[in-house]
């Protein structure tokens, strides 16, 4: 099943409630990840809904207010104002809220390149192809560094286990 039908994306049904509530509260966000890729490449089946949110105190307060209305507790008005956050909302929704990594393009840069799209027939901003390529390249680099670190750890442990 494709996530894109015409000029509209569809996804896990409960995510519509989350997205609608965030947009109604005026949360600044850009759809990223597999769902954004599915917009550009309809053959791509998306997994969860990844939303990049602007990491400002004002936007963070709007996010916290929205989550409280949706019965998701534990977030303060500054919870989403830090870089590099990845907050899964997987108990009720199949989504994650993320803030840009320190070394990655800022929210403003991602938003400036974003394209207009629809998700659940709601107007949204969606990451551009060039932004998504950059994000995927950073993910590969990070994974490669982690693999190298683990390989070195195994090598060190094997030396002392002989």
Segments (PLM) and residue ranges:
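Compositionally biased terminal segments of proteins
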Residues: 1-162
